[in-house]
Amino acid sequence: MPSFDIVSEVDLQEARNGVDNAVREVESRFDFRGVEATIELNDANKTIKVLSESDFQVNQLLDILRAKLLKRGIEGASLDVPDEFVHSGKTWYVEAKLKQGIESAVQKKIVKLIKDSKLKVQAQIQGEEIRVTGKSRDDLQSVMALVRGGDLGQPFQFKNFRD
């Protein structure tokens, strides 16, 4: 029986490349000359720290970062940015988390979405991924389109497609 897994992962190497590209652009931009502005990736806890002298510049840095990550194949929805920026001394910063794995509430929404679609497939939650099995490949491709089309707040990848 054909099956596949629904996962939500961020390739840390691609994230590092995107952060490096963003830092390179910030260093060459005229509006950031003479300004303390940094973007750092912390591999251990999978966060990106964006720091600058004003909250407006932090927003600009986040826009640059999102654009560079998108070019590296990482969608902006996989970056969890808090609404409030932290003001410390003369700098503003924000720590954005990279979303890894699918939370249980989102998993339940996906399973409910699949069951409500009346397709002849089964969805099982396995840790931080969802295994979908069905009799026909067409049903599985319909599930892929359904999950991509559903607004669930984070990007999903499909792995281990078996026929």
Swiss-Prot record:
Alphabetically ordered keywords of this record: Nucleotide-binding, Virulence
Activity regulation statement: Activity is regulated by cyclic di-GMP, which binds to YajQ and enhances the inhibitory effect of YajQ on flagellar synthesis, allowing Salmonella to survive in the host.
Disruption-associated phenotype: Deletion of the gene has no effect on the growth properties in LB medium. The expression of about 40 flagellar genes, which belong to class I, class II and class III, is significantly increased in the mutant, resulting in high flagellum expression. The mutant exhibits increased motility and higher pathogenicity.
Gene Ontology MF, one: nucleotide binding
Pfam families the UniProt entry points to: DUF520
A Gene Ontology term for the protein's cellular component: cytosol
UniProt keyword annotation of Transferase present: no
Residues given in the record as 3',3'-c-di-GMP 2 binding sites: K135, S136, R137, D138, D163
Tagged with keyword Nucleotide-binding: yes
Record: residues binding 3',3'-c-di-GMP 1: R33
Function: Cyclic di-GMP effector that influences virulence by regulating flagellar synthesis. Binds bis-(3',5')-cyclic diguanylate (cyclic di-GMP or c-di-GMP), an important bacterial second messenger that controls a wide range of cellular processes. YajQ influences Salmonella pathogenicity by inhibiting the flagellar gene transcription, thereby allowing normal expression of the flagellum. Cannot bind GMP.
Family membership noted in the UniProt record: Belongs to the YajQ family.
Domain comment (free text): Composed of two domains with a four-stranded antiparallel beta-sheet flanked on one side by two alpha-helices.
NCBIfam families cross-referenced by the UniProt entry: PRK05412.1
Name of this chain's protein: Cyclic di-GMP-binding protein YajQ
Gene transcribed to yield this protein: yajQ
